[in-house]
C-alpha cells in the first residue's frame, strides 16, 4: 500500500481507542487491549494499526513519558497521526512530544489540570492543528483565555467545540496588537 493510498484509507478508519481503561502510564498501552467499536481497526502485516486517530481519554495519565516510542509500536505510520484525544486525564502541562506530530489536526486536552496558559504556545508549531479543546482546565478561569489561545494559534477553526468566528479573530488580533496578557481571576474571599 503506497503512502498516498494509506493516507486516503486511514482517515476513514476508526480510532485506536484506549479510553476508559484506567491507564496510568503510556507504556501500559503496549500490553493493554484497545476497545472495539462497530468497525474494527485494520492492521498492517506487521500487526500495527492502520489509523490516524488515537483516543486515550478518561484515563489517569499524568505525563506522556515514552509517548513517541509507544505510538511507533502501535501505529504503522505514527507520523500521520491526525487526532489525539487526551481529555479527562491528569495532565498538568502540554508535553512537547505532541508537537512532533506535524499532521495533528485535532487535539483534545479538556478536563485535565493544565494551569499555565503559556503552555498553549507550544502548539503554535503544529501547521495543521485546526481543532483544540482546553476547557475544564484551570487555565479556563483566566480572563482572556479564549482570546489568548486564538491569538497564539491563529489557524484554529474550532476551539472548545465551538467554531471560531470573525469576531473572535478580530478580538484576538486586537489583543495581539496591544500586547494584552490574560490575568488570573482571583477567588473572592468571604468577609466575616
Swiss-Prot record:
Repeat positions for LRR: 49-71, 80-101, 103-124
Database matches in InterPro entries: Leu-rich_rpt, LRR_dom_sf
Pfam (any one): LRR_9
SUPFAM superfamilies assigned to the protein according to its UniProt record, in alphabetical order: Outer arm dynein light chain 1
Gene3D superfamilies found in the cross-reference section: Ribonuclease Inhibitor
GO CC aspect terms: cytoplasm
Domain LRRCT: 137-175
The keyword Cytoplasm belongs to this UniProt entry's keyword annotation: yes
Tissues expressing this chain: Widely expressed in adult and embryonic tissues. Expressed in the developing choroid plexus from 12.5 dpc and in the epithelium of the developing airway tract from 14.5 dpc. Also expressed in the postnatal inner ear.
Keyword Repeat tagged: yes
Entry keyword set: Cytoplasm, Leucine-rich repeat, Repeat
Domain of life: Eukaryota
Predominant subcellular localization, coarse grouping: cytoplasm
Subcellular location(s) per record: Cytoplasm
The protein, known as: Leucine-rich repeat-containing protein 51
Organism: Mus musculus (Mouse)
Taxonomic lineage: Eukaryota, Metazoa, Chordata, Craniata, Vertebrata
